[in-house]
Amino acid sequence: MSLLTEVETHTRSGWECRCNDSSDPLVIAASIIGILHLILWILDRLFFKCIYRRLKYGLKRGPSTEGVPESMREEYQQEKQSAVDVDDGHFVNIELE
């Protein structure tokens, strides 16, 4: 018998899973946190472009345009459009007031 199989056999009995039917609150909390973390990570990877663009550009409101001539409003809207519109194969929904 080689030394490798002896070591594997020896450690295998020492690392048995003892938490199959465990009702320890710490084990349950760790499992729930792990599952939630996995779900949030998957959602983040699927929708990261939408989420971060919305946070970066969607929540910012521009300055008030009251009393500003129409030509300057259009220029501001065009600048805002060019700042948000990124050509990477995805469409960006922009709602103009």
Curated annotation (Swiss-Prot):
Q: How does it sit in the membrane?
A: Single-pass type III membrane protein
TM ranges are 23-43
UniProt keyword annotations, A-Z: Disulfide bond, Glycoprotein, Host cell membrane, Host membrane, Host-virus interaction, Hydrogen ion transport, Inhibition of host autophagy by virus, Ion channel, Ion transport, Lipoprotein, Membrane, Palmitate, Phosphoprotein, Signal-anchor, Transmembrane, Transmembrane helix, Transport, Viral ion channel, Virion
Q: What does this protein do?
A: Forms a proton-selective ion channel that is necessary for the efficient release of the viral genome during virus entry. After attaching to the cell surface, the virion enters the cell by endocytosis. Acidification of the endosome triggers M2 ion channel activity.
> Domain note for this entry?
Cytoplasmic tail plays an important role in virion assembly and morphogenesis.
- Please give the family membership noted in the entry: Belongs to the influenza viruses matrix protein M2 family.
Q: What is this protein called?
A: Matrix protein 2
